[in-house]
């Protein structure tokens, strides 16, 4: 198996990841969020005050976990994000797929509010740059995330 690495942008070194269950509801619910796109983790880190740190993790095999993987933005992805952003819980250990950034989230809110149709939503998001996120939703899933190193930007 090829080694797989994921990245987490922050203002601190996160050598012991934790499941965060506070703040606003996120795309895939509460958990520890990473990406396989180093450039995206750098963008996340640059949004932080003071320090800009990219944490690098090696992933163990994920086959034993209850996973939900979205290969693209599709109807199931949209429905899942809407439910998670509304605070509905799920029973997955790991969820992976495209990210609804602020612009896409605005379109989702417009769709939820009935301001745009589902067809208009898909038209608006189809030209967005590729994004990726993987969330580790519980302590069991965090066992697959092995801290390798961190670096400052």
Locate predicted features.
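Conserved NAD+-utilizing ADP-ribose enzyme module
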Residues: 2, 27, 47-53, 58-153
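Short aromatic-glycine-(Arg/Gly/Cys) micro-motifs in beta-strand/loop hairpins
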Residues: 3-26
């Amino acid at each position: 198996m090829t080694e797989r690495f994921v990245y987490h942008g922050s203002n601190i070194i996160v050598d012991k990841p934790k499941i965060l269950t506070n703040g606003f509801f996120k795309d895939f619910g509460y958990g520890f969020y990473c990406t396989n796109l180093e450039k995206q983790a750098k963008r996340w880190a640059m949004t932080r005050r003071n320090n800009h740190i990219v944490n690098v993790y090696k992933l163990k095999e994920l086959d034993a976990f209850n996973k939900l993987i979205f290969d693209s933005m599709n109807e199931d992805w949209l429905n899942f994000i809407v439910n998670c952003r509304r605070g509905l819980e799920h029973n997955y250990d790991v969820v992976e797929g495209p990210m609804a950034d602020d612009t896409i989230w605005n379109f989702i809110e417009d769709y939820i509010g009935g301001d745009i149709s589902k067809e208009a939503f898909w038209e608006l998001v189809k030209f967005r740059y590729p994004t990726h996120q993987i969330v580790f939703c519980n302590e069991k899933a965090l066992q697959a995330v092995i801290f390798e190193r961190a670096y400052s930007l």
